[in-house]
Amino acid sequence: MLRYTRNYRLHNVASSLILKRTAIIPSLQGLRRGNFSQDDTTNLNNKKRRKRKVTSISLDDLNSVNLKKVNTKELEFKVRQLKEFTKNLKAQIKRSESRNEKRETEDDIDLEEINKDADSVFENLSNHERRKNHKVQNHLGIPIGNSQNQSTNLSSLILGSSLEQAQKFLPSTLVTRLNDNNLVLKCLTDKTRQNWNPIIKSISKNREGLNGIGKNKLNSTLLSSVKGLYFDNIERLDKMLLEYVDNDITKFTTEMYLSLFENLSNIKLTDPNMSNEVIVKMKELLERYDEALIKGTDTKMTQYILNNGIKFASKLNNHEHMEYFLTKFKGYGIIPNRINYTTVLQYYIRMGISKKSWDIFDTMKFLSKEHAPDLIAYNSVLTLCSRDKDYSKALDIYNEMVNSGINPGTSTRTIMAKILAIASRDSFTSEGKSESLRLLGWKFIHEIIETTGSKLSHKSLESMIALAAYDGDVGMSRALYHCYVTTKYRNVVQNWVGKRDYVKIWKSVLDPRMLNYLFLAYSNYNSNKLPLLLGYEQGILLRRNIINSVDYSGRSEFDDDLGVLLPFLPVTEIKHNWELLAESRAIWHFNLEYGGSTSLRSTSESIVDKSTIMTAVENSKTIDDFKWNIFSKIHELKSQTINTDVLNSIVLNTYLTIPIKLHDKKEFVLRLKEFTFQQHDFDSKIESFYLESNNKMVEDNDKNSSSPSTSEDTSIELAEDPNDLLAHYILSLKHKILANCSTYELTMKAASKFNDIKLATEAWEERGKFRKSSSFQKLAQNNRMESDTKFAELMVAFFSSQKMYTDALHVVMSSKRYIDWKYPMVKNLHRGLLEIEDSRSIDILLDIVNRKSKVQTIEETISSLTL
């Protein structure tokens, strides 16, 4: 006799408390002894089991479980995590079903019909003897001479099935004209990657084109679905649509305009000339509509059609094209909708036109509810606040968004955290509240983690490392950078198709922004300052979990072939300056060399050698042509051996700032000389070589005419050494960038930090030569003035710190004509003059600082005359 016992216990699966019932079935005595017969087993199976009534479960049965002890927040987080998992699982199932549907359709065989046909064949073959007395039949059991009326063979079933599937995507008329069901199914079955280009091209080859198809059918099955057309196929579609309306433009419908505009606006701009062709085509369509209006068309222009125009103009960053489409709204009497306003808003933000951006945003707020800003619009203006480092306005926008009922998502909180991090960079932008802003930024990060769990986006990681970097939290910054690089490397390698190209892999993995924040953390490190996250419990837990999740030794990374070892010191916390300098140099080289795939020290003589240089000389008519040819060779050299995405002035300046902040003058000078070169130095070497080469070529020609027997030896002797020197110099520039205004400003700051008059003098002289170069002269006038003003201010600050007040005052006096000196710029100089009681110099300085502009003088004169 079987005996059942039941008990209930709590089982935690995927964060849900689930009642789990277990059934305990004791073995029979015979089974335990092992001496049972087959009859005993048969009797056991045939014996009717006694049913036991199972009562329903109520909350009273759970007395042994204290549910109140469950953390409510943790339970809510687990529920949200389970919902997110369910959502992702549904998406995966949907994608899998789409792929399965594609495979089944591409087989062009209806399995159900095939089974029916196979059953028919089997029945005919098995009854072969019975069918002998009937009239002659073929091998499928189908009477010869009457096959179409009696049954359907396998080929007709396949064709019928593919025809039925093709008619799901196109009108039956078009399917018949195409006469290629396989093409239709191949191009349109996968709805996520439909390719309409072969379809439109094939339809255009038919004389009938789109004629004979009802308007409703045309709109629902073709015009509303066709997407991703190339420009030539858009032209074909437009031509067929004109033929469809018998070239009567008054019958050209709204759906036709919308389909053409949508495909035009989504064209990928691989060729610069293509953008002009697209704009011309859009204007041509609008001119066609204007002409149709004059003729009395009933077709209505819509906001959605014109939105494609402003979207494409926004993509081009072209103000003239944008204004053209905006005036069309007024011309047609169309009020822009929310989508139109948002597109224009994003365009102005991208172009850096802050005033117009805020005007558009305010207009959206004070129009109807249909025009009220949505989440996209709010996120767009928050990026504008980030650019302006205006954290107070960003907080106002965020609170306004919450009060209007819009739920700020992960992207919004990420932007807010980034804004607060950037605003905390110094006491001026943070208004003396740097730590408070970072603390508020971490609050947004905690909200993101509570919502999404441990799965953080790239933008969220960037905001986190920005907060840690400005706080000088090296331990957190290193861990975040390590997590980002290793995770992205694994994802890229796992999805890589074909033979692995590690240069391309690392180019997509290494992010210069993340590297810049890591270097910023190194430069802001202060051993006497406690990281902000260690000041409260939630921050301590977050920091500990992230740092402990990283294995700097790399042992856990090589469980498979996807592991990568970054050049970090095998410690969780760095405490010494020399460790920061060594690790920053290693990370910098690792990024420049594509993770070790290339080498800074390798020579690329195949790109630059003697013959290459002489060819450049012979092909250059002027010195400028020769410079251009050499620059192109340097660019080619860099692109093949160095990660040029990382080698830029922003990251390099942050890299150079590290030894300045850590008081290591020798390391700064080494880094400066190793990774920068001077424009005037490059010009002098190139010009002297070019002139010398031309002179030698002339001399060689003269010697060839006088003594041809010795001309060859002389030519080799003269051309050897200069070529070698220039080739080595060019090769040394492959990992260097041209020193610019910010480089000289940083050098002057270093001179002030190290109290080095020689370094300051060199920076002053080098920048004086740089001002005469073409690189500086090509800058806009306001940029040149801004750079001159900043460098002069740094010079005054340096001389004042060295108590060289006469030199500092001389800088102010010599530049007063083109620099508008303000008191904060010369405050230290004024204080120094007060200490030595130099009243004459004080009067001169204050006279320059307090002088009025010509406009102010004229205005005061006019006001005095009026009085």
Curated annotation (Swiss-Prot):
PPR repeats lie at residues 337-371, 374-408. InterPro entries: Pentatricopeptide_rpt, TPR-like_helical_dom_sf. It is found in: Mitochondrion. One of its GO terms (molecular function) is rRNA binding. The keyword Repeat applies. Keywords: Mitochondrion, mRNA processing, mRNA splicing, Repeat, Transit peptide. The keyword Nucleotidyltransferase does not apply. GO terms for biological process: mitochondrial genome maintenance; mitochondrial RNA processing; mRNA processing; positive regulation of rRNA processing; RNA splicing; rRNA metabolic process. GO terms for cellular component: mitochondrion. Residues 1-96 form a transit peptide. Regulates mitochondrial small subunit maturation by controlling 15S rRNA 5'-end processing. Localizes to the 5' precursor of the 15S rRNA in a position that is subsequently occupied by mS47 in the mature yeast mtSSU. Uses structure and sequence-specific RNA recognition, binding to a single-stranded region of the precursor and specifically recognizing bases -6 to -1. The exchange of Ccm1 for mS47 is coupled to the irreversible removal of precursor rRNA that is accompanied by conformational changes of the mitoribosomal proteins uS5m and mS26. Belongs to the CCM1 family. Involved in mitochondrial-nuclear incompatibility, a major determinant in reproductive isolation between species, through hybrid incompatibility of Ccm1 and its interacting partner 15S rRNA between yeast species. Binds to mitochondrial small subunit 15S rRNA. This is Mitochondrial 15S rRNA processing factor CCM1. It comes from Vanderwaltozyma polyspora (strain ATCC 22028 / DSM 70294 / BCRC 21397 / CBS 2163 / NBRC 10782 / NRRL Y-8283 / UCD 57-17). The lineage of its organism: Eukaryota, Fungi, Dikarya, Ascomycota, Saccharomycotina. The gene is CCM1.
